[in-house]
From Swiss-Prot:
Pfam families: Ribosomal_S9 (PF00380). GO terms for molecular function: RNA binding; structural constituent of ribosome. Gene3D superfamilies: 3.30.230.10. InterPro entries: Ribosomal_Su5_D2-typ_SF, Ribosomal_uS9, Ribosomal_uS9_bac/plastid, Ribosomal_uS9_CS, Ribsml_uS5_D2-typ_fold_subgr. Transmembrane segments: none annotated. This is Small ribosomal subunit protein uS9. The keyword Ribonucleoprotein applies. The gene is rpsI.
């Protein structure tokens, strides 16, 4: 690929995203599809754009993303994390701004496992006194 590109890996829940950024016009491609085509939900699109809007580089960089696993929310979060890491590799001075917004930290929350004898992770069967 291009020699003047930066790379970042992002993860959230069970999704993992590989993000490549290079100078361009602001085109975002996810799994060979446009951002608006890939994510139907506006909230997911907003999450993906957040770090770029924060550092005011929406029109300056092209993004090429491959993402696997998880659902819409997890994939959007993974892409955001990957974009943040790629931006830090692109320009280290952006780290403090992105850290203050909370984009640098990996969201470590995972789905809690279902336990034996319970309906879900914590939901107990209904209790009947009589």
């Amino acid at each position: 690929m291009a020699e003047n590109q930066n790379y970042g890996t992002g993860r959230r829940k069970s999704s993992s995203a590989r993000v490549f950024i290079k100078p361009g016009s602001g085109k975002i491609t996810i799994n060979q599809r446009d951002l608006d085509v890939y994510f139907g939900r506006e909230t997911a699109r907003m999450i993906v754009r957040q770090p770029l809007e924060l550092v005011e580089m929406t029109e300056k960089l092209d993004l090429y993303v491959t993402v696997k696993g998880g659902g819409i929310s997890g994939q959007a979060g993974a892409i955001r994390h990957g974009i943040t890491r790629a931006l830090i590799e692109y320009d280290e001075s952006l780290r403090s701004v992105l850290r203050a917004a909370g984009f640098v930290t990996r969201d470590a929350r995972q789905v809690e496992r279902k336990k034996v004898g319970l309906r879900k992770a914590r939901r107990r069967p209904q209790f009947s006194k009589r």
